[in-house]
Design a protein with these regions (language model features):
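General nucleic-acid-binding
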Residues: 1-19
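N-terminus-biased detector of the onset of the functional/mature region
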Residues: 5, 32, 59-60
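Short alpha-helical segments that sit at the start of domains
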Residues: 21-49
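Short, cationic-aromatic polyanion-contact patches
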Residues: 40-44, 61, 93-118
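Short amphipathic alpha-helical interface segments
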Residues: 45-59
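A short acidic, leucine-rich amphipathic alpha-helix
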Residues: 64-68
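Short amphipathic alpha-helical interaction segments
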Residues: 71-84
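A short, conserved structural fragment
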Residues: 85-94
Length: 118
């Protein structure tokens, strides 16, 4: 099963994984974010809908994806290109859109909140 992992991680961890990859250690597909806010900004409810519509469907046109989620083609076009730029979706040689994974795993997010006395 081909899984992509979305994670919030520090730059040092990304560098360590890159070094491990250069040494030949398998890393799996990962998309890393510097902050939880960046992850949440990318993975909106509407974009999750697009991924669900594309999962297992094979390559589709943006128009067909828009039809499947009952949304405006222009809005879907923008979301698709955002997901393409992030590496969540891919474009085939003939310009169709595909979700190239079987699943998405989102690593647990731990957020430290500093409380300040008023």
């Amino acid at each position: 099963m081909k899984v992509v992992t979305l994670q919030v991680t520090k730059l040092e961890e990304v560098k360590r994984r890159a070094q491990d990859a250069f040494k030949g250690k398998k890393q799996g597909a990962r998309i890393s974010f510097a902050t939880p806010e960046l992850l949440f900004r990318l993975m909106t409810t509407k974009r999750w809908e697009l991924i669900r519509a594309l999962a297992g469907a094979g390559p589709l046109t943006i128009r067909e994806v828009a039809r499947r989620v009952d949304r405006d083609v222009k809005a879907v076009h923008g979301d698709v290109h955002t997901l393409l730029n992030a590496g969540v979706l891919q474009k085939t040689g003939d310009g169709l859109i595909v979700f190239p994974f079987d699943a998405i795993h989102v690593d647990a997010i731990h957020v430290d909140v500093l409380l300040h006395a008023a």
